[in-house]
From Swiss-Prot:
Enzyme class: oxidoreductase
Pfam family, one: Aldedh
An annotated GO BP: L-proline biosynthetic process
Top-level taxon: Bacteria
Pathway(s) of this molecule: Amino-acid biosynthesis; L-proline biosynthesis; L-glutamate 5-semialdehyde from L-glutamate: step 2/2
Job of this protein: Catalyzes the NADPH-dependent reduction of L-glutamate 5-phosphate into L-glutamate 5-semialdehyde and phosphate. The product spontaneously undergoes cyclization to form 1-pyrroline-5-carboxylate.
EC assignment: 1.2.1.41
CDD domains: ALDH_F18-19_ProA-GPR (cd07079)
Gene Ontology cellular component annotations, sorted alphabetically: cytoplasm
GO MF: glutamate-5-semialdehyde dehydrogenase activity; NADP binding
Similarity comment: family membership: Belongs to the gamma-glutamyl phosphate reductase family.
Transmembrane spans: none
Protein name: Gamma-glutamyl phosphate reductase
Amino acid sequence: MTVDLNKMGQAAREASRQLALLGEQKKNQVLETVAQELLAKADEIIAANKVDLENATNMPEKFIDRLKIDNDRIAAMAEGVRQVAQLADPIGKIDAGWVNYAGLQIEKKRVPLGVVGMIFEARPNVTVDASALCFKSGNAVILRGGKEALQTNIKITKVIRQALEQEGINPDAVQVITETSHELANEFMQLTDYLDVLIPRGSARLIQTVLNTAKVPVIETGAGICHVYVDKFADKKMAVEITTNAKVQRPSVCNAIENLVIHQDVAQEYLPAIADELQKYNVELRGDEKVCEILGDKATLATAEDWDTEYNDYIIAIKIVSSIDEAIDFINEHNTKHSEAIITENYTRSQKFLDEIDAACVYVNASTRFTDGFEFGFGAEIGISTQKLHARGPMGLEALTSTKYVIRGNGQIRK
């Protein structure tokens, strides 16, 4: 192997010590330089991306959408970096403080995790997002992207490292693995001497592989089998607009819905309107027998597998239920604990949905597409966690920190 992960890990650990001591003003100055360099080197980044796109000509459209970079997306990346710079620095924040019975002053203080490992697929924006968030939270990061985006990731990382050097920061705070073999990926996932946490972003298959292989602690950023439930007290216009937005605005991402659940009392009236709007975008409709009776040849019969499939495409599975309890049970059985929405004008039923749905983000009368660090005001996000330990939902700066207890005394000894 030409890549020495132990050397990369050692270098990242050394860089992380410098980052942990940086003040907020310096961090923000560095991030502004990173944003400026991304914009200044846009042509170089797009040229590198073109090489990756040429090598991916046989890939599906949804894959190409995630891989492609243009001036607008680079501008969005730079804006994301600037958003991170504007956020309050969590490092050094005191979560709690008290004096115990012995007169010890105890504080619970926010500190960096240390060295973060990222494994992701054809999403070059993750390179920028992860670098900015890790830097602002005082962490070094080692990036392992998919082979399909290798040239883009190498170029973006080079631009970021140059910006760090301009500001007198150890460039090894941001490193990319330039070899994409499975053997090296497995070694990376077991780099316990240097990595404090591993964060995968990508398909359900990638995330499961990381969970099965890693010895480093993992924050699971799960796949997105998300639902909209149209309650019997839903506003029809809202049901049509939210369902359509949640499915078609960007179907290749994890917060797009895959399943629509609708109450039988409004299905006869609402479903044709929803179907007509979805079919304007050539969405393929799959449904249970009742759905097919209502929609006729507009829909095909769904299989059991459809309810558990993350399509990331213009396909939706539709289920008619007889009660809100059936809707909740169905969603909890088939979801990936990501994002779920109810459309209803009934407050009591909305509260029931909020209380009983097991997911990182639960919406009332809004699209699941808002599950995003930028939309939540976190700036860029490191991922969307679907687990319950350490972090859950869109992961911003605080999710990349831990705590330490600082205790000050004046000679106390325990008796």
